[in-house]
C-alpha cells in the first residue's frame, strides 16, 4: 500500500451577514481551469510560509492565511479577532491532494466584493438553504465540506447565533464508500467508519451523495 499524500495546512473563512430572511453567506466560483474548477466555495487557500510566523499552532497559521486569502479573492479585509474556528476538515487518505483545512466563520466586513478574475470568476450572496437547493437542481456544484457547512448554517437566523453555538471546532476526518453506485462520505461517529459496512445499523454521520444529497447524523 502506498503512503497517503501529506497533509497541507489550509484555511477557509465563511463570511456571513444577517439578511431579512436569515443568514446570507458569500460564495465564490472557482476558475474552471484550476483545481476544484467551477465549484462554488468560500474564500480560502493553503497556508503560505509567512503565515506560519503568526503562532505555534496550525489553527493560528490558518487564521492568518484566511485573512490574507479573503483580501486577495474578495477585496474584503476581515478582522482576525472576529473569526470563530468551527470545523477542521481532513480528506481521506486516498485523495491525491490532501488539505488539512480549518473553517472559520466571521461577520462580513463592509465594502464592495471585488473578485480577482484569476482564481475566482464570480461571486454571490446566498442563504444556505438556497445554495443547497441550487446544488440539488444542478445549477451549482459544491464539495462536501461546503455542503455540510451550508447545512449547519441553515439552522441559524444570525451570524452571531451561529458563532455562539460553537464550543470547539468539530473534526471531520473523512472516509469514503459506496452504496451501490452512490458515493458516501462518512466521519468518526458513523457505524461504518471502521468497518465500511454502510448498510449495517447503528449511529450515522455521513453524507449520501446521490442526485439529491442527504446528510445523516445521529448524535
Report residues per predicted region.
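N-terminal leader/linker segments that precede catalytic domains of diphosphate-processing enzymes
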Residues: 1-120, 125-219
Amino acid at each position: 500500500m502506498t503512503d497517503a499524500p501529506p497533509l497541507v495546512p489550509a484555511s477557509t473563512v465563511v463570511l456571513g451577514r444577517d439578511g431579512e430572511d436569515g443568514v446570507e453567506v458569500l460564495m465564490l466560483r472557482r476558475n474552471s481551469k484550476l483545481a476544484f474548477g467551477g465549484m462554488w466555495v468560500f474564500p480560502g487557500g493553503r497556508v503560505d510560509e509567512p503565515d506560519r510566523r503568526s503562532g505555534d499552532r496550525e489553527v493560528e497559521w490558518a487564521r492568518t492565511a484566511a485573512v490574507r486569502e479573503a483580501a486577495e479573492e474578495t477585496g474584503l479585509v476581515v478582522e482576525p479577532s472576529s473569526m470563530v474556528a468551527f470545523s477542521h476538515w481532513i480528506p481521506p487518505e486516498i485523495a491525491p491532494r490532501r488539505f488539512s483545512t480549518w473553517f472559520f466563520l466571521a461577520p462580513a466586513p463592509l465594502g464592495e466584493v471585488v473578485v480577482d478574475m484569476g482564481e475566482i470568476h464570480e461571486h454571490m450572496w446566498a442563504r444556505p438553504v438556497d445554495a443547497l437547493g441550487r446544488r440539488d437542481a444542478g445549477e451549482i456544484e459544491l464539495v462536501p465540506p461546503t455542503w455540510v457547512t451550508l447545512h449547519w448554517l441553515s439552522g441559524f437566523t444570525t451570524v452571531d447565533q451561529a458563532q455562539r453555538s460553537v464550543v470547539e471546532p468539530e473534526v471531520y476526518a473523512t472516509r469514503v464508500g459506496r452504496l451501490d453506485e452512490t458515493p458516501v462520505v462518512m466521519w468518526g461517529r458513523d457505524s461504518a467508519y471502521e468497518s465500511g459496512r454502510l448498510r449495517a445499523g447503528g449511529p450515522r454521520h455521513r453524507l449520501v451523495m446521490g442526485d439529491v444529497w442527504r446528510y445523516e447524523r445521529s448524535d
